[in-house]
């Protein structure tokens, strides 16, 4: 059994020995206190003296063999009868200043535990220290089996310390109280932890500051790198630009020699700027001619193949004999050969004989001609090249040629040839001996609604054909509606009218209006000018006054009609049939042709145009104020359908009939009820011209044209032609550049029956 008390030998001295023990324990306590202060309480705490187990007890308890061997080795160091337990991270055993164990024979029993020494106040050491050296004092005995952590925990709560050597020993204060030492150690631990936390936080803040400084330095470094790269890139670009400029300033041969890349090849440099302007024009002309030659060759080859396939299909559908089919194919082959020879033949003015002049204009004239080799009659339209340049009519001339050449419709005048010389462009077209619609209006003044319905229906079909080709006529008027030999109409003058091309330019009318207001004092629409006479005011206040068909006014209308014909041959023209949106530069479409149709219909039923005036300026004002100026006279009766159709045509572009539905929208109007649109051209016309010969021009004002002088441009061109003929010269090549490809020949001229 484990005995926690210490037995002294009987007969030992009491008083002297007690004084000696008290002095010896004071020295021991001082050394232990000094030693505890020097050591780190977190690493090692001094062990109380005289705490150990006997070797016999360890053997009886069956301790480990290694521990027994260790105890046997240590027995010689501690004297007889005592062994020492190996220290677990304890410092070395204090110096053997206490010879009490050596001088007193102790029973070989287990020594008292540390808990017994520090837990009880009646132990031998405290008794000796207090002067009570009685060896009969009994200490409480605890066996190892009776010791537990719970008992130690309860003892700690009561202020006593644990006696287990396997728990960390605590430092004793001078008064022997363990609880105060425990609190001091815990407070010291908390202080150390707080200091460590502060240090950790300081280290973290320093690390963060250092990281931020590193990031800023890295960003600055990256920015510097980017700036350096940009500067290097700019320098490289500048060097490349300088090299390109140097290369451009040098010829390829020089640059090749400089770069060392020249080989046995020979380099040619294109420098057209070193050539004269005339040479450059000739080179451009040759280029365009070659391009046009191959384009036309491919086009004619495709058309030739299509004609043969069409004929073979037609022959297959008929039950003809093989001999007859062979004759048809042979006839087609002969016509193709003639056409190829005709294409290679260069036509000129000398190939035609002029019968008479049937029309004049600002830029040319219209002649009745006869081809010398065939004797057929044609209408030749002549246009002056120099005026086309000056008046910016090159696009219009080309458009007119394309429309006439690309259309096979019976509603459009047929074009047979087109060619040119140094001064003029020539269009050889079919001759329509019935004249034009203006001639019929001058002769009969008024049309009935049935006659008007017939001609307006044919005009709708003709305009629809032009629109399907992708063109806008923009100059539909009675002068350009021709009558063929059977009395049906055809449209002509596409893009260029004889003397009316300026009416398509709003600046022209604005200029005329400003000049007229500044010089003649003509008032604006709806205003009254007191400086003019009453008679003039009656004719110039268009908004208020309307033309009434009195005898005097009818005479004025007839006079206007005669002057209207002469006006067509002048350079001034009249805007009677032009839509208002053309003047405003607001953009226009195909609906502008339907306005012209409404104006012509008004003239056929009423007897004069809806905005008739004595001057173009007045007509312009009336058209721009059509809502007030469009009036119907009371003494001329027309049907409600006719008036409704006219009003729906002479209105704003967005509300105009035909704007959205095209020609079909106009065809469905009640005024055209009963019209057979599919067979109208086979219907007998209201008027069929009667001719005495193929050169009969009674329906053309040839007598009036004799008194019309040629335009200054035409007169000057005639003089230049005479001089060029005498000198044998030619016009500059520059004037031929826009007209390359203007030449044209129609294949089916050989079989057309309407050519006279």
From Swiss-Prot:
GO biological process, one term: regulation of protein secretion
Complex formation: Associates with PAG1/TAO3 and interacts with MOB2.
CDD domains in the cross-refs: MobB_CBK1, STKc_NDR_like_fungal
Catalytic activity: L-seryl-[protein] + ATP = O-phospho-L-seryl-[protein] + ADP + H(+); L-threonyl-[protein] + ATP = O-phospho-L-threonyl-[protein] + ADP + H(+)
SMART domains in alphabetical order: S_TK_X, S_TKc
Compositionally biased region (Low complexity): 23-34, 242-255
Keyword set, alphabetical order: ATP-binding, Kinase, Nucleotide-binding, Phosphoprotein, Serine/threonine-protein kinase, Transferase
UniProt function note: Protein kinase that seems to play a role in the regulation of cell morphogenesis and proliferation.
Additional remarks: Present with 450 molecules/cell in log phase SD medium.
Binding residues for ATP: 358-366, 381
GO cellular component, one term: nucleus
InterPro entries in the record: AGC-kinase_C, Kinase-like_dom_sf, Prot_kinase_dom, Protein_kinase_ATP_BS, Rho-assoc_Ser/Thr_Kinase, Ser/Thr_kinase_AS
Gene Ontology molecular-function annotations: ATP binding; identical protein binding; protein serine kinase activity; protein serine/threonine kinase activity
The organism's place on the tree of life at top rank: Eukaryota
Domain Protein kinase, chain residue ranges per copy: 352-672
The keyword Transferase appears for this protein: yes
One Pfam assignment: Pkinase
Modified-residue entries (Phosphothreonine), positions: 109
Residues of the AGC-kinase C-terminal domain: 673-754
Organism: Saccharomyces cerevisiae (strain ATCC 204508 / S288c) (Baker's yeast)
Family: Belongs to the protein kinase superfamily. STE Ser/Thr protein kinase family. COT1 subfamily.
Ranges of compositional bias, category Polar residues: 53-77, 120-180
Protein name: Serine/threonine-protein kinase CBK1
Catalytic site: 475
């Amino acid at each position: 059994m484990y005995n926690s008390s210490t037995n002294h030998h009987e007969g030992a001295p009491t008083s002297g020995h007690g004084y000696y023990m008290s002095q010896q324990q004071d020295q021991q306590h001082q050394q232990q206190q000094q030693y505890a202060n020097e050591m780190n309480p977190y690493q090692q705490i001094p062990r109380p003296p005289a705490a150990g187990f006997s070797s016999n007890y360890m053997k009886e308890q069956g301790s480990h063999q290694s521990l027994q061997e260790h105890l046997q080795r240590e027995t010689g160091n501690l004297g007889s009868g005592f062994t020492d337990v190996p220290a677990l991270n304890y410092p070395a055993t204090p110096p053997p200043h206490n010879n009490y164990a050596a001088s007193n024979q102790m029973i070989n029993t287990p020594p008292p535990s540390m808990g017994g020494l520090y837990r009880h106040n009646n132990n031998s050491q405290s008794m000796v220290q207090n002067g009570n050296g009685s060896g009969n004092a009994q200490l409480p005995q605890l066996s190892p089996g009776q010791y537990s952590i719970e008992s130690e925990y309860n003892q700690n709560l009561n202020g006593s310390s644990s006696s287990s050597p396997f728990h960390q020993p605590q430092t004793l204060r001078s008064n022997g109280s363990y609880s105060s030492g425990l609190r001091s150690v815990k407070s010291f631990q908390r202080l150390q932890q707080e200091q460590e936390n502060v240090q950790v936080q300081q280290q973290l803040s320093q690390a963060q500051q250092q990281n931020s400084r590193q990031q800023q330095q890295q960003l600055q470094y990256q920015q510097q790198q980017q700036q350096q790269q940009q500067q290097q890139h700019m320098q490289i670009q500048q060097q490349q630009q300088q090299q390109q400029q140097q290369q451009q300033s040098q010829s390829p041969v020089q640059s090749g020699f400089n770069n060392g890349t020249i080989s046995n090849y020979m380099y040619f440099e294109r420098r057209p700027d070193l050539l004269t302007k005339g040479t450059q024009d000739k080179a451009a002309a040759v280029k365009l001619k070659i391009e046009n030659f191959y384009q036309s060759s491919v086009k004619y080859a495709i058309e030739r193949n299509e004609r043969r396939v069409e004929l073979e299909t037609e022959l297959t559908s008929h039950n003809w004999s093989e001999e007859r089919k062979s004759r048809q194919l042979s006839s087609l082959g002969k016509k193709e050969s003639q056409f190829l020879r005709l294409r290679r033949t260069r036509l000129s003015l000398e190939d035609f004989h002029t019968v008479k002049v049937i029309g004049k204009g600002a830029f040319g004239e219209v002649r009745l001609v006869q081809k010398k080799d065939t004797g057929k009659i044609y209408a030749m339209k002549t246009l002056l090249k120099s005026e086309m340049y000056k008046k910016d009519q090159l696009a219009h001339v080309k458009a007119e040629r394309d429309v006439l050449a690309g259309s096979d419709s019976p509603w459009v005048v047929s074009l047979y040839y087109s060619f040119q010389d140094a001064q003029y462009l020539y269009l050889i077209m079919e001759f329509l001996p019935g004249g034009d619609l203006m001639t019929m209006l001058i002769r009969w003044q008024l049309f009935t609604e049935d006659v008007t319905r017939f001609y307006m229906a044919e005009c709708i079909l003709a305009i629809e054909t032009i629109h399907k080709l992708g063109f806008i006529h923009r100059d539909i008027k009675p002068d350009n509606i021709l009558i063929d030999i059977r009395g049906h109409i055809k449209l002509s003058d596409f893009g260029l009218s004889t003397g009316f091309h300026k009416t398509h330019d709003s600046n022209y009318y604005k200029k005329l209006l400003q000049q007229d207001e500044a010089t003649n004092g003509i008032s604006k629409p709806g205003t009254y000018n007191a400086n003019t006479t009453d008679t003039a005011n009656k004719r110039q206040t268009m908004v208020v006054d309307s033309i009434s068909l009195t005898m005097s006014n009818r005479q004025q209308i007839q006079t206007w009609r005669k002057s209207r014909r002469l006006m067509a041959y002048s350079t001034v023209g009249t805007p009677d049939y032009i839509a208002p949106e053309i003047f405003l530069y607001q953009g226009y479409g195909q609906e502008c042709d339907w306005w012209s149709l409404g104006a012509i219909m008004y003239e056929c039923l009423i007897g004069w145009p809806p905005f008739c005036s004595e001057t173009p300026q007045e007509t312009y004002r009336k058209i721009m104020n059509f809502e007030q100026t469009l009036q119907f006279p009371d003494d001329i009766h027309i049907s409600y359908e006719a008036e409704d159709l006219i009003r729906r045509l002479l209105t704003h572009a967005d509300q105009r009939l035909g704007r959205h539905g095209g020609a079909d929208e106009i065809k469905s109007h009640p005024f055209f009820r009963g019209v057979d649109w599919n067979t109208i051209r086979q219907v007998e016309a209201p008027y069929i011209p009667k001719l005495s010969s193929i050169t009969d021009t009674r329906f053309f004002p040839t007598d009036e044209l004799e008194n019309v002088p040629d335009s200054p441009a035409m007169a000057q061109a005639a003089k230049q032609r005479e001089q060029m003929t005498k000198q044998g010269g030619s016009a500059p090549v520059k004037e031929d550049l826009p007209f390359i490809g203007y030449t044209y020949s129609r294949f089916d001229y050989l079989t057309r029956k309407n050519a006279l």
